Curated annotation (Swiss-Prot):
Binding-site positions, Zn(2+): 102, 111, 120, 123
Quaternary state and interactors: Homodimer.
Cofactor note: Binds 1 copper ion per subunit. Binds 1 zinc ion per subunit.
Entry keywords, A to Z: Antioxidant, Copper, Disulfide bond, Metal-binding, Oxidoreductase, Periplasm, Signal, Zinc
Family: Belongs to the Cu-Zn superoxide dismutase family.
A single Gene Ontology CC term: periplasmic space
Endpoints of the signal sequence: 1-18
Protein name: Superoxide dismutase [Cu-Zn]
Catalysed reaction equations from the record: 2 superoxide + 2 H(+) = H2O2 + O2
Residues annotated to bind Cu cation: 85, 87, 102, 158
EC code: 1.15.1.1
Annotated gene: sodC
Naturally occurring in which organism (per UniProt): Francisella tularensis subsp. holarctica (strain LVS)
Length: 185
């Protein structure tokens, strides 16, 4: 009888692990045990993955002061900067257009960058790409409070930089949507 229970236990464990593997392979992001969110970034035109961006609480002197955004990206244009934003919708379809506009839960209708509380909450620091086409430099997004509030949105990287203003061009002048990752519920 003991062998029967061991066999049943092993079978159940196999089913659970297989289900977990299936779920993680089909999610656009992963939730780590240490309170991290890993967003898989893809080219909006080719749908080819260019790496991941990890989002985790930024703790300084024992207090949370926003979220730490750590890119692990490759095959990007060398020596460039790119506007980075949280967009409203959890979709990267239609060349990134389905992501909607910048996440603005307070309806400020202002693009003032990541350090001004009077603008879009989805305004993040720019992404800097190294000479070898990788982006690995972490940045802090002080307006973001939790991983949970990011669920149901998307993370977007634009073709150009971001001047954190609506002038001379709206939304920081970042231009076309280039790389996107869904942050699903």
């Amino acid at each position: 009888m003991t062998a029967f229970y061991k066999l049943c236990g092993m079978s159940m464990l196999s089913l659970v692990l297989a289900d977990c593997t299936f779920l993680s392979a089909n999610k656009p992001y992963d939730r780590d045990h240490d309170g991290e969110l890993i967003v898989h970034m893809k080219d909006v035109n080719t749908h080819k993955e260019v790496g991941t961006i990890t989002i985790s609480p930024y703790i300084h002197d024992g207090n949370q002061e926003g979220m730490l955004i750590t890119p692990h990206l490759y095959n990007l244009p060398a020596n460039t900067t790119h506007g980075m934003h949280i967009h409203i919708n959890p979709s990267c379809e239609d060349n990134g257009i389905a992501a909607g506009g910048h996440w603005d839960p307070d309806n400020t209708q202002k693009h003032l960058g990541p350090y001004n509380d009077n603008g879009h909450k989805g305004d993040l620091p720019v992404l800097v790409v190294n000479a070898d086409g990788t982006a690995t430099e972490p940045v802090v997004a002080p307006k973001l409070n939790s991983l949970e509030e990011l669920a149901g949105h998307s993370l977007m990287l634009h073709a150009g930089g971001d001047n954190y203003s609506d002038k001379p061009q709206p939304l920081g002048g970042g231009g076309a949507r280039m790389w996107c990752g869904v942050i699903a519920d």
